[in-house]
Amino acid sequence: MMIIVSSIIAVLMAVAVMVVRIKSSDKPVSPKKIILPPIFMSTGALMFLFPVFWVTGAEFLEAFTLGVIFSIFLIKTSKFEIKNNEIYMKRSKAFVFILVGLLVIRIVMKSILSTSIDYGALSGMFWILAFGMIVPWRIAMYLSYRKLHNELQSSNIQMN
């Protein structure tokens, strides 16, 4: 039952991310908007204060490594563009498909792993996977943003 509930919540969160992503492409990006999500998500690590969520070293490495691998797809579909002297996220149709694909993979993995791994530890592993995915993605976004921001600044200086 918990697997079904958590899968429904994951679907709702994915839909929310897609809506936010589409709406945010209409507004300029700032470093704060890139950096804050992983910081906010890091508070979820407090779950590991409770033994029910503890994972082994191998489970941690597996989950984190898989998250880093998944982040590559997000990094490849997150591009910026300059419009009206401001930096915006480019809309990407591939991003939606990748997000849905990652969600399907997550649900399938959770269904399979829930038969052999305790639900609390599995929840911890999926948090680690998500954190391992969002941190490299946001670091890559920030570096890309800084590069574009510096180009924008130097072109503004040359114009003056």
Curated annotation (Swiss-Prot):
Membrane-spanning ranges: 2-22, 34-54, 55-75, 94-114, 117-137
Subcellular location: Cell membrane
GO cellular component: a single term: plasma membrane
Keyword Transmembrane helix carried by entry: yes
Nucleus among keywords: no
Membrane topology: Multi-pass membrane protein
Keywords: Cell membrane, Membrane, Transmembrane, Transmembrane helix
Xref: PANTHER family: PROTEIN CCDC (PTHR39164:SF1)
Protein name: Protein CcdC
Lineage, top ranks: Bacteria, Bacillati, Bacillota, Bacilli, Bacillales
Name of encoding gene: ccdC
